[in-house]
Design a protein with these regions (language model features):
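Conserved, non-catalytic sequence blocks in retroelement Pol enzymes and Pol-derived host proteins
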Residues: 50-54, 80-88, 102-107, 134-138, ...
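Short, conserved micro-motifs composed of acidic
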Residues: 202, 465-468, 480-515
Length: 668
């Protein structure tokens, strides 16, 4: 009888080698490209081209042609499993170890393993010194890239899975899905606006050469190019050589209110909203537009935004100077705490959700709003041109293969990812405001809250009335309210009569939730902040793991301290003044434990949760005091005799520990 003993061999996980062709930006290549642009007579392009479209296409094509010929191309292999500190010598030792394993030479294998350990320490030390040198030379981008490699941090990628052979069809379906709001024909209304506004005496906006130079030099080299393939690195590096021709193109566009078709073209990249993206609605349509167009948008925005500022809703916290997420959260929580401090009161909060809000802007409704704010009529015509007849296509990457959809031309919406779109949406929704002081509308871009501070039955009826008005306003402005994703959260600490009728919108019941995540902060109906603290604690512990991995490289303590401040402490500090005062001791202990572990690594005295909360509250209060236009400023009162802040009277502990009463009480 023969007994055959099976022998099993572990199969290693292998990442396929990726070959990539890149252009080498070395010194000789830069000099060749610079000479090419310096020797170019741009006047030849201007004289020989008929119209702005042709001129822009020729200039863009010429820039790409010069870049292709002046810069050398190099094919590189990317080994997925290789770390940057694995040198050739290290690789040869690892291969030698594999051979010993295959030959079952244990003695030789042990010797090689000892050599690998020593070599690994040497390689990691060398790589660590490179990263520290980048820090000393203020190369923050290179330093953070190296730190990510050391801690093993990778950006999460969600692959788009489609049926094989139907990728192009799916690509077209995505483009049609993103174009679904362009169903109305308002061409007559748009033509009437053009006719009424075109005859005006307003000055024509003009851009100077030094403005273009400044815009090009401020570009980030690593950003993606648009459909015209003109790279920001090229414009930034050769800003002096290219600014003349683009100054001419920009001024031509502003004078005649014409935008080249290629500049209005959007290359849509579907970006997953979550890890489990399956349906088309789970992908956010981010538009890549030409870099020169973004520069021109910045100039136009700077020209008309100061005119609009006085008219903007004070409860709109996005895209405003001296405003941010923290201000919106503080205004929201202060309303809740201060109102609940009065007897027999409760708060009903409606968190509204729009379907692709930016894609629903109607130009014929937006332009009159701009005109009413006193914006230059020629700028209004230029913005109208920017929003109408916009070609767009979807770019889809499945594995190593790319697919392009057919082109759709749109007259509705503003592309996500452009400079002007956010502020245009803010202006579009600017007149959507509450009619009652106790029912404010709090807005952060398209994240809108209707907050009802209720004491009486009449207040409740006003709340229902406001929702009805808001629904009608959305219908009149072609904004699609997603009732399924709209939620209601109720804060009610009354002992009796705390039953609430469900809210109805468009004959659909709005779901009432016990907690809701708004702008990164988790609110619960009991205001105990347990879920928020747990979320923060989980994130901090994840980053603490990365910090320990970084410490294993024996990096300089300054870099460790920077990592602690930027990646761990910042998580806790985010909106801490809004909830820190009312956090429970149980949650504080967990967070203090995490802070203590991190500070131990960098050999510093551990920071305390309460001390950090107090410091951040004081800092924020000073900013509010300095800004008289802040929505919280009217709540602050000064003594006529001493000039000191007057303490806010409170009835409940939760209001006493909230931001304003707590910060004013501890103000020096």
């Amino acid at each position: 009888m023969v007994y055959l003993l099976p022998q099993y061999k572990t199969k290693l996980l292998r990442v396929p080698v990726v070959e990539k062709t890149v252009r080498v930006w070395n010194e000789s290549g830069r000099e060749r490209l610079k000479d090419c642009f310096e020797m170019t007579d741009w006047q030849v392009f201007i004289d020989s081209c008929d119209g702005l479209d042709e001129l822009n296409d020729h200039v863009s094509g010429y820039i790409n042609f010069c870049e292709q010929n002046a810069l050398e191309e190099k094919t590189v292999k990317i080994f997925g499993n290789n770390k940057p500190w694995v040198t050739k010598e290290m690789k040869s030792l690892l291969n030698e170890k594999k051979r010993c394993f295959m030959e079952k030479n244990k003695e030789r294998g042990k010797q090689i393993q000892n050599k690998i350990k020593l070599k690994m320490k040497e390689c990691k030390k060398s790589y660590k010194e490179k990263i520290e040198e980048k820090f000393r030379t203020n190369d923050s981008k290179g330093m953070w890239a190296g730190v990510k490699q050391m801690i093993g941090f990778k950006d999460k990628e969600t692959k788009i899975s489609t049926e094989k052979g139907k990728e192009k069809e799916y690509c077209d379906q995505l483009n049609n899905f993103y174009s679904r709001f362009d169903t109305y024909d308002f061409s007559k209304e748009i033509q009437n606006i053009k006719k009424d506004v075109s005859e005006n005496n307003d000055h024509i906006l003009q851009i100077e050469r030094h403005d273009v130079l400044k815009l090009f030099r401020s570009l980030k080299s690593n950003k993606a190019s648009g459909p015209d393939d003109v790279k920001p690195k090229t414009l930034k590096t050769f800003a002096f050589e290219l600014c003349d021709i683009f100054t001419h193109i920009f001024n031509f566009s502003l004078k005649f209110n014409i935008i080249p078709t290629s500049w209005k073209t959007s290359k849509i990249i579907p970006v997953p909203k979550s890890k489990t993206a399956k349906e088309m609605n789970d992908f956010r349509p981010v538009a890549l537009t030409p870099v020169p167009m973004k520069c021109l948008e910045k100039f136009v925005l700077k020209s008309f935004l100061p005119t609009c500022e006085p008219y903007l809703d004070p409860n709109q916290f996005a895209y405003r100077a001296k405003r941010g997420v923290e201000d919106a959260i503080l205004f929201f929580t202060n309303n809740v705490y201060s109102h609940l401090d009065t007897p027999k009161s409760y708060v009903r909060t409606l968190f509204l959700d729009f379907s692709s809000a930016f894609n629903t802007i109607q130009p014929h409704l937006l332009i009159p709003k701009l005109l009413n704010m006193g914006v230059n009529k020629n700028i209004c015509l230029w913005i109208l041109e920017f929003l109408t007849e916009r070609p767009q296509f979807v770019f889809l990457k499945c594995g190593n293969t790319s697919f392009l959809s057919s082109i759709n031309v749109l007259n509705t919406g503003a592309p996500q990812g452009t400079v002007l779109s956010p502020i245009l949406f803010t202006i579009y929704t600017n007149d959507c405001r509450g009619s009652f002081n106790n029912i404010p509308f709090i807005k952060y871009a398209d994240d809108t809250i209707i907050q009802a501070l209720i004491n009486t039955l009449n207040d409740l009826l006003n709340y229902y009335d406001e929702i009805e008005k808001f629904t009608k306003w959305c219908s009149d402005h072609y904004l699609q309210l997603n009732v399924k994703k709209t939620k209601e959260l109720i804060f009610d600490f009354r002992k009796k009569n705390n039953t609430h009728d469900p809210l109805m919108i468009k004959n659909e019941t709005v779901e009432r939730v016990t907690e809701y995540k708004y702008l990164g902060v988790v609110f619960d109906e009991n205001l105990n902040w347990e879920s928020q603290a747990a979320k923060v604690n989980g994130k901090m512990n994840q980053r603490l793991y990365f910090m320990r991995k970084l410490n294993s490289f024996n990096v300089d303590n300054v870099i460790l301290a920077l990592f602690y401040q930027s990646c761990i402490l910042s998580i806790l500090a985010f909106c801490l003044p809004a909830w820190g005062g009312n956090a429970r001791e149980k949650e504080k202990r967990k967070l203090n434990r995490c802070l203590k572990s991190a500070c131990k690594i960098i050999s510093e005295n551990p920071q305390n949760f309460d001390a950090l909360s107090l410091a951040l509250c004081a800092k924020k209060l000073n900013k509010v005091i300095e800004d008289e236009t802040h929505p919280l400023y009217p709540q602050i009162r000064f003594s006529s005799r001493s000039g000191k802040l007057i303490h806010i009277r409170t009835r409940t502990v939760r209001f006493s520990n909230s931001f304003l009463p707590f910060a004013i009480r501890n103000h020096e």
